[in-house]
Design a protein with these regions (language model features):
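Feature captures hydrophobic
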Residues: 1-158
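Short, structured patches in soluble enzyme cores that scaffold and shape functional sites
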Residues: 43-45, 124-126, 241, 256-258, ...
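Short acidic (Asp/Glu) patches
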Residues: 77, 85, 89-105, 220-224, ...
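Generic beta-strand structural signal
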Residues: 78-80, 111, 116-118, 122, ...
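Non-heme Fe(II)-dependent double-stranded beta-helix
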Residues: 147-264
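Short, solvent-exposed loop/turn segments at secondary-structure junctions
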Residues: 181-183, 242-245, 259, 281-283, ...
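Catalytic core of non-heme Fe(II) oxygenases with the double-stranded beta-helix
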Residues: 250-315, 353-363
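Conserved double-stranded beta-helix
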Residues: 298-323, 327-328, 333-416
């Protein structure tokens, strides 16, 4: 697949070549500190367009005390072996910051939450401290450059989301249960309350800029698959907001989020939102209510229109996300139990639309995340990059090809 410069797909030839270059340089520079070490990885069920033998991506890195060799193939005798499913391996490969305390544990925890405990298995240990540091830095270096699997149908099937994409098309919303671990949900909830406290507010925008937890949450691979299916590749963050709701009557009436869109609304989705449950959602907790299929009305609800009886409460366990087409009729339910419901709302627009929040791209934020965050902040498209000579042709061609491939795979998914 076509990618931007310095980007590559997981386990592609370009990925292997970059691993070889980085490891050879690092081992030469730190030769005095190193002892021989080896790492071998094998991931099954890679996307067909990579054209890997039997759709298995495998590679081995071995340092013999003098030189580093990197080659395709799996070596079960390596000091550390990693095996699993390609999509799960990719999810782990896009975690960055592996030298931070607890980072490896957090990565494995979240991959297990998305793909199951046995999706990736690691055996062995690197004893040499310098070698371990080199491999952690390699992981980060590649993670900053590794793009998402562009094959939407393949990706959705391996994430267990094929049904959800069909459901989203039919009823306008879908729920992914436990898309993050309960532990991470607790971390995000605590970070949200810390951000809200100084402002003495029940809601706040610009949550992306209040901690690493929000950077990680908004690019959750499961949610990203629904975004790609609904809005196409290149979708941008419209707004990332938080709401804290205590006991009482729901104050947000039935509405769509297409306030300024002329009726009839387009048949395709212009915008979408993922709402994260940071505690269990039940009827008593005051969840969002939705009318299934109401997006097909292609209009706003009329004053006095008595359709609430068709509504469904969104009940889901902590760590789940409900994603919905913004033309769906929805409202805030009454909270009848004590305590606060804390939610995060990740709003997205098709790439051709503007964000609701001012663009504030932090270079350090881009450096500590996978390319997906840059795509969501508009860094990969050609808008705002016009010169006197015209548009950025490289980015224009990249996004055109990615859009076309994604749409073709979505049609394939819905046809089967």
């Amino acid at each position: 697949m076509h990618t931007l410069p310095d980007r590559f797909e997981f386990l592609s030839d370009a990925w292997i070549d970059e691993a070889r270059r980085v490891l050879a340089k690092a081992c030469e520079q730190r030769k005095a500190e190193l002892a021989p070490f080896s790492l071998s990885e094998r991931f099954a069920d890679a996307p067909p367009h990579l054209k890997l033998p039997d759709d298995v991506g495998a590679w081995t890195a071995r340092y013999d005390g003098e030189a580093m060799t990197v080659a395709r193939g799996f070596d079960p005798s390596a000091d550390v072996t990693v095996e699993g499913d390609y999509q799960a391996g990719l999810a782990g490969g896009q975690f960055i910051g592996m030298l931070a305390p607890g980072a490896m544990k957090a990565m494995r925890r979240e991959v297990a939450a998305m793909h199951g405990r046995d999706a990736v298995k690691m055996k062995g240990r690197i004893e040499n401290a310098a070698a371990g540091e080199i491999l952690a830095l390699l992981h980060d270096h590649l993670g900053r450059r590794t793009v998402e699997n562009p094959d939407l149908a393949h990706r959705a099937a391996r994430q267990g989301l094929t049904r959800h994409i069909r459901e989203m098309e039919e009823q306008g919303y879908t729920v992914i249960e436990r898309a993050i671990s309960p532990e991470f949900a607790d971390e995000v909830r605590a970070a949200t309350l810390r951000a809200l406290l100084p402002h003495q507010s029940f809601s706040m925008n610009w949550m992306l800029y209040h901690g690493r937890e929000f950077e990680q949450l908004i690019q959750n691979p499961m949610l990203m698959t629904l975004i790609d299916a609904s809005l196409g590749r290149g979708a941008v963050i419209a707004s990332f907001s938080s709401i804290k709701k205590g006991p009482g009557t729901g104050v947000i009436p039935m509405h769509t989020d297409y306030a300024h869109v002329p009726e009839p609304f387009p048949e395709f989705s212009l915008t979408g939102v993922g709402v994260w449950a940071l505690e269990d959602w039940t009827v008593a907790s005051g969840p969002t209510w939705m009318i299934p299929g109401s997006h097909r009305e292609r209009r706003n609800p009329r004053p006095g229109e008595n359709t609430r009886g068709q509504g469904v409460p969104i009940e889901m366990p902590k760590g789940s996300v409900v994603y919905f087409h913004k033309a769906v009729w929805h409202w805030q339910g009454d909270r009848t139990e004590p305590g606060d419901r804390v939610t995060l709302h990740a709003h997205f627009n098709r790439g051709i639309l503007r964000s609701l929040e001012p663009k504030k791209t932090d270079v350090q934020m881009l450096h500590r995340n996978s390319p997906r965050l840059g795509e969501m902040l508009g860094e990969d498209d050609w808008f705002d990059k016009m010169s006197a000579q015209g548009r950025d042709s490289g980015r224009f061609a990249y996004m055109n090809k990615l859009h076309a491939f994604t749409e073709a795979k979505k049609r394939e998914l819905l046809a089967n």
